[in-house]
């Protein structure tokens, strides 16, 4: 898959993802908490607060929420700039409340982390950096300039400067850490979501191709008799019109076109007959079907199929599941792309498992990313090697992820490794020296039960 500027999976395009309703609900929660804190602090704790100014600050949020609720539709999506402005308003309103209520002597100064965390989850990194810098600036301002908290006896509440500095430093570190951490988590979630979408699209495409093949096969079967009739009649006309060359040539053209239609339908429906007998096949045939698009690409593809201890001499008959064929095909494509000359595909079976191994004679996986192979958007081989072996190709790092996801959906376990030490010299490396992928299924997840019915008998009405 190619990452294009207008592609559905373009990860850099994240505008219009957040609904205005979501931020409105969060703001209502903040308003309720602020009102509760102000009332409890003034009425029950006996701290004298400038209630008028405090209620004015909270009222600004209430007015903004009411206007947003009645002016804009509930399903309104926010652009990057609009979301930034809303979060800046909330950050400024909270900082003003801190200015009125003691600055860093107010433990609720910790809430200044909330807008930055939301930005890290929802907005891009530049917006989050801007919001974080403004938050640190406002926090520093309220640390030096604020109205003191006056207790009931008229004394002001103060804390040691060292404690105040420590609280400021803790919040600054929290802004930096939570901003980066929430951003990283959001990227991981979005990457996984995009990759799963790509996987589902690949599986749907494979399923649609299979369904289309079945439709074509049925059409070829239904059109067989009319085409045969056209061919027979045109042949008879050609014989009867032997003395009229012009008309005879027309009859010959009709016969040739009927043959062409037959050949086209036969070739299109060869792989798509939708009967249950064609939904299963020997392990070797299914592997060859998966490898077929990559056999003629200039690399030698060798198959080796054998039973292991306790396995039957005959190849197991397995289901031709689209996710199995497409997943194995992706693994074979990756091996062919990076092999020097040869790809080996081994099939092995026992009484309780089926295993396939795909090995190439390329450079193998970089040791630094072997543990991450199968994660979305990870380039699986060295960049310079990828460009030389796949010129003009700009992948998304989804090939092995799609293969791994599809095969695991079928019940398989995958493992990735290098067949040899990548730091060995050329003459020291064995023939099978590149990347190796092993896929193992339990027998009951893949093998067709012998002597099982192929399907329901069709009721014949007489």
From Swiss-Prot:
Tell me what gene encodes this: regB
Q: Which NCBIfam families match?
A: ActS_PrrB_HisK, HisKinRegBRhodob
CDD domains, from UniProt? HisKA (cd00082)
Q: What is the lineage of its organism?
A: Bacteria, Pseudomonadati, Pseudomonadota, Alphaproteobacteria, Rhodobacterales
Its UniProt entry gives the catalysed reaction(s) as: ATP + protein L-histidine = ADP + protein N-phospho-L-histidine
Q: Which keywords fit this entry according to its UniProt record? A: ATP-binding, Cell inner membrane, Cell membrane, Kinase, Membrane, Nucleotide-binding, Phosphoprotein, Transferase, Transmembrane, Transmembrane helix, Two-component regulatory system
| Spans within the Extracellular topological domain | 46-51, 97-103, 150-164
The EC number(s) given in the record are 2.7.13.3
Membrane-crossing ranges are 26-45, 52-70, 79-96, 104-123, 130-149, 165-182
Native species = Cereibacter sphaeroides
The name of this protein is: Sensor histidine kinase RegB
Modified positions (Phosphohistidine) in chain numbering:
221
Tell me the compartments it is located in: Cell inner membrane
Question: What SUPFAM superfamilies does the record tag this protein with?
Answer: ATPase domain of HSP90 chaperone/DNA topoisomerase II/histidine kinase (SSF55874), Homodimeric domain of signal transducing histidine kinase (SSF47384)
Pfam families noted in UniProt: HATPase_c (PF02518), HisKA (PF00512)
Enumerate the spans annotated as Histidine kinase domain: 218-445
């Amino acid at each position: 898959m190619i990452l294009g500027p207008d592609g559905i999976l373009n990860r850099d395009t994240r505008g219009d993802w957040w609904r205005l309703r979501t931020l409105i609900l969060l703001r209502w929660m903040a308003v309720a908490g602020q009102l509760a804190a102000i009332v409890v602090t003034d009425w029950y704790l006996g701290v004298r607060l400038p209630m008028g100014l405090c209620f004015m600050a909270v009222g600004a949020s209430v007015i903004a929420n009411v206007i947003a609720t009645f002016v804009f539709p509930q399903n309104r999506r926010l652009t990057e700039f609009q979301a930034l402005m809303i979060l800046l308003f909330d950050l400024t309103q909270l900082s003003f409340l801190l200015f009125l209520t003691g600055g860093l002597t107010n433990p609720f100064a910790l809430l200044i982390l909330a807008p930055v965390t939301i930005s890290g989850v929802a907005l891009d990194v530049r917006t989050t950096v801007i919001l974080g810098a403004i938050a640190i600036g406002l926090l520093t301002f309220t640390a030096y300039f604020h109205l003191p908290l006056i207790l009931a006896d008229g004394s002001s509440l103060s804390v040691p400067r060292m404690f105040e500095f420590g609280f400021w430093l803790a919040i600054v570190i929290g802004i930096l850490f939570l901003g980066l951490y929430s951003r990283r988590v959001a990227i991981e979630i979005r990457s996984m979501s995009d990759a799963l979408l790509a996987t589902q699209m690949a599986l749907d495409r494979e399923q649609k191709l299979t369904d289309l093949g079945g439709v074509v096969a049925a059409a070829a079967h239904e059109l067989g008799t009319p085409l045969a009739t056209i061919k027979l009649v045109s042949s008879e006309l050609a014989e009867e019109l032997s003395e009229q060359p012009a008309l005879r040539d027309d009859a010959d053209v009709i016969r040739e076109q009927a043959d062409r239609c037959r050949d086209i339908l036969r070739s299109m429906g060869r792989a798509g007959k939708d009967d249950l007998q064609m939904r299963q096949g020997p392990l070797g045939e299914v592997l060859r079907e998966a490898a077929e698009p990559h056999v003629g690409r200039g690399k030698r593809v060798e198959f080796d199929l054998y039973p292991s201890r306790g396995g039957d001499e005959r190849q197991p008959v397995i289901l031709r599941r689209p996710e199995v064929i497409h997943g194995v095909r992706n693994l074979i494509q990756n091996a062919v792309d990076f092999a020097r000359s040869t790809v080996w595909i081994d099939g092995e079976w026992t009484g309780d498992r089926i295993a396939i191994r795909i090995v190439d004679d390329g450079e193998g996986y970089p040791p630094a990313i072997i543990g991450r192979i199968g994660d979305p958007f990870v380039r699986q081989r060295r960049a310079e090697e990828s460009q030389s072996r796949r010129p003009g190709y700009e992948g998304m790092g989804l090939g092995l992820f799609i293969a791994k996801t599809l095969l695991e959906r079928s019940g398989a376990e995958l493992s990735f490794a290098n067949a040899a030490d990548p730091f060995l010299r050329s003459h020291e490396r064995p023939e099978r020296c590149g990347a190796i992928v092993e896929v193992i299924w339990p027998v009951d997840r893949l093998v067709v039960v012998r002597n099982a019915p192929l399907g329901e008998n069709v009721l014949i009405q007489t």
